Regions:
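Bulky hydrophobic segments
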Residues: 1-104, 114-134
Length: 134
């Protein structure tokens, strides 16, 4: 039995993250609310973890070891977080916003990405632990 809710949750969450991000840019939420960026990275990490778990359930038949699933999910979250931070750094360099302050921000972003991934993994792992693995 495959948990059909994973794909549904992942699609709904990515749509919500996209709407929140576009709204934040247009309404300057990232400037007005300093915590908003952390929330968005948490949700982004959560979404990546959902997508990774969906991939595992649909394409990897041997997934019984929860530690291997956890490592896979967190590595996916970190990989996407690092790619996003490289993108952000490139954009900041392109528009000439730079400085050492971007390093602590990048570290904070990666921490919140990872926290979102961990929370998503724990929730999904708990909801699916009684399902039969195919």
């Amino acid at each position: 039995m495959k948990p059909a809710f994973l794909l549904s949750w992942a699609l709904k969450l990515i749509l919500a993250v996209l709407v929140l991000h576009i709204s934040a840019i247009l309404l300057y939420f990232y400037v007005i609310f300093p915590w908003y960026d952390n929330m968005m990275h948490f949700l982004g990490g959560f979404w990546i973890a959902l997508a990774a778990m969906t991939f595992l359930w649909n394409f990897i038949s041997s997934q019984k070891n929860p530690w291997l699933r956890f490592i896979f999910v967190i590595l996916c979250v970190l990989l996407m977080g690092i790619v996003w931070e490289i993108y952000e750094f490139g954009v900041q360099d392109w528009i000439k916003i730079t400085g050492i302050a971007s390093i602590p921000d990048s570290i904070s972003d990666l921490v919140f990405d990872t926290l979102g991934g961990i929370v998503a993994f724990l929730i999904i792992n708990n909801k699916t632990k009684n399902l039969n693995h195919e």
